[in-house]
Amino acid sequence: MLTVISPAKSLDFESPAHTKRFSDPVFLSSSRELITELRKQSPAQISKLMKISPKLGELNAQRYKAWKPPFAPDNAKQALLAFRGDVYMGLDADTLTSRDLTFSQKHLRILSGLYGVLKPLDLIQPYRLEMGTRFRNKRGKDLYEFWGERLTTAVREELSGHRNKTLVNLASNEYFRSIDAASLGHRIVTPVFKDYSNGTYRILSFFAKRARGRMASHIIRERINKPEDLKRFDLDGYRSEEHTSELQSPDHLVC
């Protein structure tokens, strides 16, 4: 079983990593292609492209300019420990043990606009490039066309090495669009987190992001490798509501 999550815009490259272990991104040459194109953009163009402030446009122009492989612990950081934000607050990666990290390295992947697919301990350098950015490049009109079938193929190949070939989708819609579900060839389970608000259960973005991180953490810490075991998830007031059959399907787990 393999779980995918989204990255985060918030980054932490100041705090020291609590592990010395690291790995390398598999699509680094493709990342280099994107960086080459991004360096042609002025800070003002970056601000317009990403709909961010001039200050953030300048920051990211500097990041693209400074981006330089090969990566090492002195100029980069493990992806799972570098990303911050709601999902990662729920995941709480800084408290994962060495054995947890070993399990996550096989069972968790992070989808990324710049790096494609990341293992938790893959080294990255600071960047901002959301998957939904309409950045025209040599391969197409946006990042979905840039990555094409490559991310689907990578995930499919990862799953081929697992006994249980189920993909658990804890990523946002923006990022999971980079995976062609129809051609993946394996079962996909998508947990859905709902909160009671104004008389009904619905998805509240902030809480849903945090809950996706909590479930990813639960999968890692409990060594869950069968999708049916996800029904035991019971944290922060979320739990599988199997009795509400109208909300359930074999490929959706409503919490």
Predicted regions and their residues:
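A glycine-rich, hydrophobic loop/mini-helix early in the fold
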Residues: 53, 57-127
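Conserved nucleotide-cofactor-binding alpha/beta core module
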Residues: 119, 131-141, 150-153, 199, ...
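Accessory, usually C-terminal, subdomains that scaffold auxiliary metal cofactors
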Residues: 183-239
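A contiguous strand-loop segment
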Residues: 23-81, 153-157
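Short, extreme N-terminal leader segments that mark the start of a protein/domain
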Residues: 1-43, 245
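Hydrophobic alpha-helical segments, chiefly the membrane-spanning helices
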Residues: 247, 253-255
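A contiguous pocket-lining binding segment that forms or flanks enzyme active sites
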Residues: 135-192
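Conserved small/polar residues in nucleotide/adenosyl-binding loops
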Residues: 242-248
